Amino acid sequence: MMNVGQWLTRVRKESPLVHNMTNVVVTNFVANGLLAVGASPVMAYAKEEVADMVRLARALVLNIGTLNETDVEAMLIAGKAANEANIPVIFDPVGAGATAYRTETARRILREVNISILRGNASEIASIAGEQVRTKGVDAGDVQSDLVDVAKKAAHMFRCVVVITGKDDIVTDGERIVIVSNGDAMLTKVTGTGCLLSSVLGAFAGVGEDVMTSSVAALAYYGVAAEKAATQAKAPGSFQLSFLNALHETSAEEVDQYARIQGE
Protein backbone atom coordinates (compact mmCIF):
# COMPACT_ATOMS: atom_id res chain seq x y z
CA MET A 1 0.00 0.00 0.00
CA MET A 2 2.67 2.48 1.01
CA ASN A 3 6.13 2.91 2.40
CA VAL A 4 4.99 3.35 6.00
CA GLY A 5 8.50 3.58 7.40
CA GLN A 6 9.10 6.89 5.65
CA TRP A 7 6.57 8.52 7.96
CA LEU A 8 8.61 7.51 11.01
CA THR A 9 11.73 8.90 9.37
CA ARG A 10 9.93 12.18 8.77
CA VAL A 11 8.71 12.40 12.38
CA ARG A 12 12.21 11.85 13.71
CA LYS A 13 13.69 14.38 11.30
CA GLU A 14 11.13 17.13 11.93
CA SER A 15 10.33 16.42 15.62
CA PRO A 16 6.83 17.93 15.38
CA LEU A 17 5.45 19.74 18.42
CA VAL A 18 2.28 17.97 19.56
CA HIS A 19 -0.08 19.90 21.83
CA ASN A 20 -1.74 17.39 24.15
CA MET A 21 -4.84 18.16 26.18
CA THR A 22 -4.99 14.72 27.70
CA ASN A 23 -6.04 13.18 31.00
CA VAL A 24 -4.28 13.28 34.34
CA VAL A 25 -3.81 9.50 34.49
CA VAL A 26 -1.51 9.33 31.47
CA THR A 27 0.22 12.71 31.10
CA ASN A 28 3.73 11.57 32.01
CA PHE A 29 3.52 8.39 29.93
CA VAL A 30 2.26 10.29 26.88
CA ALA A 31 5.00 12.91 27.14
CA ASN A 32 7.75 10.32 27.50
CA GLY A 33 6.23 8.22 24.74
CA LEU A 34 6.24 11.11 22.29
CA LEU A 35 9.85 11.86 23.16
CA ALA A 36 10.72 8.21 22.54
CA VAL A 37 9.05 8.37 19.13
CA GLY A 38 11.05 11.47 18.24
CA ALA A 39 8.32 14.10 18.55
CA SER A 40 8.11 17.04 20.95
CA PRO A 41 5.27 17.10 23.50
CA VAL A 42 3.66 20.07 25.17
CA MET A 43 0.87 19.82 27.73
CA ALA A 44 -1.08 23.07 28.10
CA TYR A 45 -4.62 23.28 29.48
CA ALA A 46 -5.34 26.86 30.57
CA LYS A 47 -8.02 28.46 28.44
CA GLU A 48 -6.05 31.70 28.59
CA GLU A 49 -3.15 30.24 26.58
CA VAL A 50 -4.31 27.22 24.59
CA ALA A 51 -5.12 29.18 21.44
CA ASP A 52 -1.63 30.69 21.41
CA MET A 53 0.03 27.38 22.23
CA VAL A 54 -1.76 25.38 19.55
CA ARG A 55 -0.61 27.81 16.86
CA LEU A 56 2.96 26.79 17.67
CA ALA A 57 2.16 23.10 17.29
CA ARG A 58 1.92 20.75 14.32
CA ALA A 59 -1.00 18.79 15.81
CA LEU A 60 -3.55 19.05 18.61
CA VAL A 61 -4.70 15.99 20.58
CA LEU A 62 -7.91 16.18 22.64
CA ASN A 63 -8.56 13.40 25.18
CA ILE A 64 -11.54 13.39 27.56
CA GLY A 65 -10.33 10.64 29.89
CA THR A 66 -10.64 12.72 33.06
CA LEU A 67 -13.52 14.92 32.08
CA ASN A 68 -14.54 18.29 33.52
CA GLU A 69 -16.18 21.43 32.16
CA THR A 70 -13.11 23.62 32.59
CA ASP A 71 -11.02 21.37 30.36
CA VAL A 72 -13.84 20.99 27.82
CA GLU A 73 -14.08 24.77 27.47
CA ALA A 74 -10.33 24.95 26.90
CA MET A 75 -10.48 22.08 24.40
CA LEU A 76 -13.11 23.89 22.35
CA ILE A 77 -11.02 27.06 22.31
CA ALA A 78 -7.91 25.12 21.27
CA GLY A 79 -9.79 23.09 18.67
CA LYS A 80 -11.25 26.15 16.98
CA ALA A 81 -7.84 27.85 16.97
CA ALA A 82 -6.32 24.74 15.39
CA ASN A 83 -9.03 24.75 12.72
CA GLU A 84 -8.28 28.39 11.90
CA ALA A 85 -4.57 27.58 11.57
CA ASN A 86 -5.16 24.38 9.54
CA ILE A 87 -3.54 22.26 12.25
CA PRO A 88 -4.82 18.65 12.43
CA VAL A 89 -6.95 17.78 15.45
CA ILE A 90 -7.00 14.24 16.85
CA PHE A 91 -9.88 13.39 19.19
CA ASP A 92 -9.87 10.48 21.64
CA PRO A 93 -13.38 10.18 23.17
CA VAL A 94 -12.32 8.07 26.15
CA GLY A 95 -15.27 6.31 27.76
CA ALA A 96 -17.93 7.62 25.38
CA GLY A 97 -21.00 5.49 25.98
CA ALA A 98 -20.22 4.92 29.66
CA THR A 99 -22.25 7.95 30.83
CA ALA A 100 -24.64 10.36 29.14
CA TYR A 101 -22.42 13.32 30.07
CA ARG A 102 -19.35 11.74 28.53
CA THR A 103 -21.16 10.76 25.33
CA GLU A 104 -22.77 14.17 24.88
CA THR A 105 -19.48 15.95 25.56
CA ALA A 106 -17.81 13.88 22.85
CA ARG A 107 -20.58 14.75 20.41
CA ARG A 108 -20.36 18.42 21.37
CA ILE A 109 -16.65 18.52 20.59
CA LEU A 110 -17.32 16.80 17.26
CA ARG A 111 -20.02 19.36 16.46
CA GLU A 112 -17.96 22.42 17.30
CA VAL A 113 -14.48 21.39 16.13
CA ASN A 114 -13.46 19.99 12.75
CA ILE A 115 -11.68 16.78 13.68
CA SER A 116 -9.03 15.25 11.42
CA ILE A 117 -8.78 11.86 13.18
CA LEU A 118 -11.27 10.25 15.55
CA ARG A 119 -9.56 7.43 17.48
CA GLY A 120 -11.28 5.09 19.92
CA ASN A 121 -12.20 1.54 20.73
CA ALA A 122 -15.21 -0.16 19.19
CA SER A 123 -17.73 0.77 21.85
CA GLU A 124 -16.64 4.42 22.02
CA ILE A 125 -16.96 4.97 18.27
CA ALA A 126 -20.22 3.00 18.08
CA SER A 127 -21.76 5.07 20.88
CA ILE A 128 -20.85 8.37 19.26
CA ALA A 129 -22.15 7.16 15.91
CA GLY A 130 -25.50 6.25 17.44
CA GLU A 131 -25.09 2.48 17.62
CA GLN A 132 -26.62 0.80 20.66
CA VAL A 133 -23.91 -0.72 22.82
CA ARG A 134 -23.35 -0.98 26.55
CA THR A 135 -19.94 -0.01 27.85
CA LYS A 136 -18.23 -1.37 30.95
CA GLY A 137 -16.10 1.46 32.26
CA VAL A 138 -13.92 2.74 29.45
CA ASP A 139 -13.07 -0.64 27.92
CA ALA A 140 -14.53 -1.97 24.70
CA GLY A 141 -17.99 -3.49 24.98
CA ASP A 142 -19.67 -5.95 22.65
CA VAL A 143 -20.59 -4.16 19.45
CA GLN A 144 -23.09 -6.12 17.36
CA SER A 145 -22.78 -4.03 14.22
CA ASP A 146 -20.04 -4.77 11.78
CA LEU A 147 -17.12 -2.62 12.89
CA VAL A 148 -16.16 -1.58 9.40
CA ASP A 149 -19.66 -0.25 8.81
CA VAL A 150 -19.56 1.56 12.15
CA ALA A 151 -16.23 3.14 11.24
CA LYS A 152 -17.47 4.21 7.80
CA LYS A 153 -20.65 5.64 9.30
CA ALA A 154 -18.67 7.69 11.81
CA ALA A 155 -16.27 8.89 9.11
CA HIS A 156 -19.19 10.18 7.03
CA MET A 157 -20.98 11.68 10.04
CA PHE A 158 -17.98 13.63 11.26
CA ARG A 159 -16.13 14.09 7.95
CA CYS A 160 -12.86 12.73 9.28
CA VAL A 161 -10.61 9.70 9.32
CA VAL A 162 -11.82 7.17 11.89
CA VAL A 163 -9.50 4.74 13.66
CA ILE A 164 -11.07 1.90 15.64
CA THR A 165 -8.40 0.09 17.61
CA GLY A 166 -8.55 -3.49 18.84
CA LYS A 167 -6.93 -6.78 17.97
CA ASP A 168 -7.09 -5.52 14.39
CA ASP A 169 -7.13 -1.77 13.82
CA ILE A 170 -9.57 -0.30 11.30
CA VAL A 171 -8.77 2.93 9.45
CA THR A 172 -11.22 4.61 7.09
CA ASP A 173 -12.02 7.96 5.56
CA GLY A 174 -15.50 6.71 4.73
CA GLU A 175 -14.43 5.28 1.38
CA ARG A 176 -11.04 3.62 1.72
CA ILE A 177 -10.67 0.85 4.31
CA VAL A 178 -7.36 -0.34 5.74
CA ILE A 179 -6.80 -3.00 8.40
CA VAL A 180 -3.59 -2.97 10.46
CA SER A 181 -2.92 -6.18 12.38
CA ASN A 182 0.19 -5.36 14.39
CA GLY A 183 0.35 -5.09 18.18
CA ASP A 184 0.36 -7.23 21.30
CA ALA A 185 -2.21 -8.03 23.99
CA MET A 186 0.15 -6.68 26.65
CA LEU A 187 -0.80 -3.17 25.49
CA THR A 188 -4.13 -3.69 27.27
CA LYS A 189 -2.33 -4.29 30.59
CA VAL A 190 -0.69 -0.86 30.76
CA THR A 191 -2.86 2.21 31.23
CA GLY A 192 -2.32 5.01 28.75
CA THR A 193 -1.24 3.00 25.73
CA GLY A 194 -4.37 3.98 23.82
CA CYS A 195 -3.97 7.61 24.85
CA LEU A 196 -0.34 7.59 23.75
CA LEU A 197 -1.39 6.07 20.43
CA SER A 198 -3.73 9.01 19.83
CA SER A 199 -0.82 11.37 20.41
CA VAL A 200 1.43 9.34 18.10
CA LEU A 201 -1.30 9.64 15.46
CA GLY A 202 -0.98 13.39 16.02
CA ALA A 203 2.79 13.35 15.58
CA PHE A 204 2.49 11.47 12.28
CA ALA A 205 -0.38 13.70 11.07
CA GLY A 206 1.77 16.72 11.82
CA VAL A 207 4.39 15.85 9.21
CA GLY A 208 2.20 15.24 6.16
CA GLU A 209 -1.01 16.10 4.37
CA ASP A 210 -2.75 12.72 4.05
CA VAL A 211 -4.06 11.82 7.51
CA MET A 212 -5.42 8.50 6.27
CA THR A 213 -1.95 7.34 5.22
CA SER A 214 -0.25 8.88 8.25
CA SER A 215 -2.68 7.04 10.53
CA VAL A 216 -1.94 3.68 8.91
CA ALA A 217 1.79 4.34 9.26
CA ALA A 218 1.44 5.35 12.92
CA LEU A 219 -0.58 2.23 13.74
CA ALA A 220 1.88 -0.07 12.01
CA TYR A 221 4.85 1.53 13.77
CA TYR A 222 3.14 1.45 17.16
CA GLY A 223 2.16 -2.19 16.74
CA VAL A 224 5.59 -3.29 15.56
CA ALA A 225 7.16 -1.57 18.57
CA ALA A 226 4.70 -3.35 20.88
CA GLU A 227 5.56 -6.70 19.34
CA LYS A 228 9.24 -5.96 19.80
CA ALA A 229 8.72 -5.00 23.45
CA ALA A 230 6.67 -8.13 24.12
CA THR A 231 9.60 -10.35 23.18
CA GLN A 232 11.61 -8.74 25.98
CA ALA A 233 9.00 -8.37 28.74
CA LYS A 234 6.28 -10.69 29.98
CA ALA A 235 4.67 -8.57 32.72
CA PRO A 236 3.04 -5.11 32.67
CA GLY A 237 5.72 -3.22 34.60
CA SER A 238 8.62 -4.42 32.51
CA PHE A 239 6.55 -4.15 29.33
CA GLN A 240 5.91 -0.44 29.91
CA LEU A 241 9.64 0.16 30.14
CA SER A 242 10.43 -2.08 27.18
CA PHE A 243 7.72 -0.44 25.09
CA LEU A 244 9.14 3.06 25.62
CA ASN A 245 12.54 1.69 24.62
CA ALA A 246 11.05 -0.04 21.57
CA LEU A 247 9.35 3.16 20.43
CA HIS A 248 12.79 4.77 20.47
CA GLU A 249 14.67 1.86 18.93
CA THR A 250 12.30 0.61 16.21
CA SER A 251 13.60 1.62 12.80
CA ALA A 252 11.77 2.64 9.66
CA GLU A 253 13.13 -0.50 8.01
CA GLU A 254 11.65 -2.69 10.75
CA VAL A 255 8.26 -1.03 10.32
CA ASP A 256 8.32 -1.71 6.58
CA GLN A 257 9.44 -5.30 7.15
CA TYR A 258 6.98 -6.29 9.87
CA ALA A 259 3.91 -4.14 9.15
CA ARG A 260 0.79 -6.23 8.51
CA ILE A 261 -1.51 -4.04 6.43
CA GLN A 262 -4.50 -5.02 4.32
CA GLY A 263 -6.55 -2.71 2.13
CA GLU A 264 -6.18 0.26 -0.15
From Swiss-Prot:
GO-annotated biological processes: thiamine biosynthetic process; thiamine diphosphate biosynthetic process
GO MF: ATP binding; hydroxyethylthiazole kinase activity; magnesium ion binding
Stored InterPro entries: Hyethyz_kinase, Ribokinase-like
Annotated binding of ATP, by residue: R119, T165
Keywords: ATP-binding, Kinase, Magnesium, Metal-binding, Nucleotide-binding, Thiamine biosynthesis, Transferase
Reported cofactor(s): Mg(2+)
Keyword ATP-binding: yes
Top-level class of the enzyme under EC nomenclature: transferase
Pathway: Cofactor biosynthesis; thiamine diphosphate biosynthesis; 4-methyl-5-(2-phosphoethyl)-thiazole from 5-(2-hydroxyethyl)-4-methylthiazole: step 1/1
HAMAP family to which the protein is assigned, alphabetical: Thz_kinase
NCBIfam families from the UniProt entry: PRK09355.1, thiM
Function text: Catalyzes the phosphorylation of the hydroxyl group of 4-methyl-5-beta-hydroxyethylthiazole (THZ).
Family designation: Belongs to the Thz kinase family.
Protein name: Hydroxyethylthiazole kinase
